Regions:
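Small-molecule-sensing regulatory modules
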Residues: 44, 49-203
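A conserved helix-loop-strand patch within extracytoplasmic ligand-binding domains
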Residues: 1-53
């Protein structure tokens, strides 16, 4: 969380933001009869929209722990963030990639952000910061806040820039009903776009 004393500073270049399906080593086709290891309602609800007969089983632990459980036979597949696998040099484990339109990511997914005491390292952070990424993540976090989505809530948002134009994808499973929506407009109106998308998802 951010506060005035310890603000967010530099936003990294965004790694691939989507989620992926990972199969056990040596397996090339997902067996729908085996459970899918998935942490979080956002992924669970969206995956079940794509595959209504899928059996979802909760999973905990870091990426390597989850992969060990997968390869031991406890799960038939996992749903993970592609960015995490790439940063661990495990891209070869990816079997299926889901686009942000198919499975809307969590706000800020794929981005590393610094946080430090106010006023410290300000010049360095300016050099490290990527303003367009910062705008996208702040817009995504704005939507999440408007929907009152904490880190465990079934809420997703992904902002994409095309020049000065922004496309904002949103997902909400609040209330148990999955809803998808998108809005488009000028990036200078990013806050208003987040508010418009929140209204669509709350209707």
């Amino acid at each position: 969380e951010e506060n005035a004393a310890i603000p967010l500073g530099a936003y990294s270049i965004r790694e691939t933001p989507g989620d992926v399906l990972v199969l056990p080593k040596g397996v090339f086709h997902w067996n729908p009869a085996q459970p899918i290891g998935c942490a979080g309602l956002r992924r669970t609800m969206q995956f079940q929209e794509l595959y209504s007969d899928a059996v979802i089983k909760p999973i905990r632990g870091n990426v390597l722990t989850r992969l060990e459980k997968l390869d031991s036979g406890a799960y038939g597949a996992l749903i993970l963030a592609e960015a995490g696998l790439k940063r661990l040099n495990l891209s070869d484990r990816i079997s299926v990639r889901f686009s942000p339109e198919q499975m809307v990511p969590a706000a800020g997914q794929g981005v590393i952000v610094t946080q430090s005491r106010a006023g410290e390292y300000s010049e360095l952070l300016k050099q490290l910061n990527h303003p367009d990424v910062a705008l996208c993540v702040k817009t995504e976090r704005r939507l999440s806040a408007l929907l009152e989505g904490d880190c465990s809530a079934p809420v997703g948002c992904h902002a994409r820039l095309h020049g000065n134009h922004m496309t904002l994808y949103g997902f909400s499973g609040l209330g148990g009903v999955p809803k998808h929506a998108l809005v488009q407009g000028e990036k200078t109106n990013a806050a208003a776009l987040a508010e418009a998308l929140a209204r669509q998802l709350q209707d």
